[in-house]
Amino acid sequence: MANSPTPTMLAFLALGLALLLSATGQASAQNCGCQSNMCCSKWGYCGTGKDYCGDGCRSGPCYGGGGGGGGGGGGGGGGGGGSGVSVESVVTEAFFNGIKNQAPNGCAGKNFYTRQSFLNAAHSYSGFARDRTNDDSKREIAAFFAHVTHETGHMCYINEINGASMDYCDKNNKQWPCQPGKKYYGRGPLQISWNYNYGPAGQNIGFDGLRDPDRVAQDPTISFKTALWFWMNNVHQVMLQGFGATIRAINGALECNGKNPGAVNARVNYYKDYCRQFGVDPGGNLYC
């Protein structure tokens, strides 16, 4: 028939459709803008679960292991995708043990926290120290371990001192309700606390944080994963504002604005020391 499309016309139509879809995909990826607890998938859409946080995840609490689309949001897991430094090359055995060896003998954490457990956890959060410049990446690693050092006493403590006697249950939080007999005191490298942190952290990592919070003090990889989960959701995005912004994100209500200058100074000194070890300037806005 005279009005039937020819093979050549069909080919041009198919090519045009492919280009349109490609452009749409790129535009949505560039403007993902997900909430902090959601992942930006390799196709540029927000959500949770392996379809969004797995292979090719661009930003957010990515599972890692991907190697898909790099760029501004985080790139692939492990050694592929994204910019920044290799975390493994910065966090050497000498650096990690240099912190831990300052803890007194007999500390529970000395036989719990290991460099390998940290690296295993870091592979699940591909945006950590991987989506910015080399110097920015080193500063982020220095900041993370400065807070870990302060929170755990050079990796001495796994559990918060006298934590079991504290009440970290927000009964008004209906999404992550406290479970009978369970305590949500500080555990792990960043001493994650409160039911509203244990619940979503466990959901993201793959354990029941509300019913089994002690898991954070029993499995060193899960322990580091909870720290990195908290970091990526609460601290990573303010890192470029300076180390002081990270203090405010972690414990600002109790330390900033002159409330505990000794704690602030300790965190800053650890950070400056680790930046020196990494050969990078610590930048400005160090205090809060």
UniProtKB/Swiss-Prot annotation:
InterPro entries, per database record: Chitin-bd_1 (IPR001002), Chitin-binding_1_CS (IPR018371), Endochitinase-like_sf (IPR036861), Glyco_hydro_19 (IPR016283), Glyco_hydro_19_cat (IPR000726), Lysozyme-like_dom_sf (IPR023346)
A GO molecular function held by the record: endochitinase activity
One GO-annotated biological process of the protein: cell wall macromolecule catabolic process
Disulfide feature: 32-40, 34-46, 39-53, 57-62, 107-156, 169-178, 256-288
SUPFAM superfamilies on file: Lysozyme-like (SSF53955), Plant lectins/antimicrobial peptides (SSF57016)
Tissues expressing the protein: Expressed in sheaths and meristems and at lower levels in roots and leaves.
Keyword Signal applies: yes
Keywords tagged on the record: Carbohydrate metabolism, Chitin degradation, Chitin-binding, Disulfide bond, Glycosidase, Hydrolase, Plant defense, Polysaccharide degradation, Signal
EC main group: hydrolase
CDD domains: chitinase_GH19, ChtBD1
Reactions performed catalytically: Random endo-hydrolysis of N-acetyl-beta-D-glucosaminide (1->4)-beta-linkages in chitin and chitodextrins
Protein name per UniProt: Chitinase 5
Organism: Oryza sativa subsp. japonica (Rice)
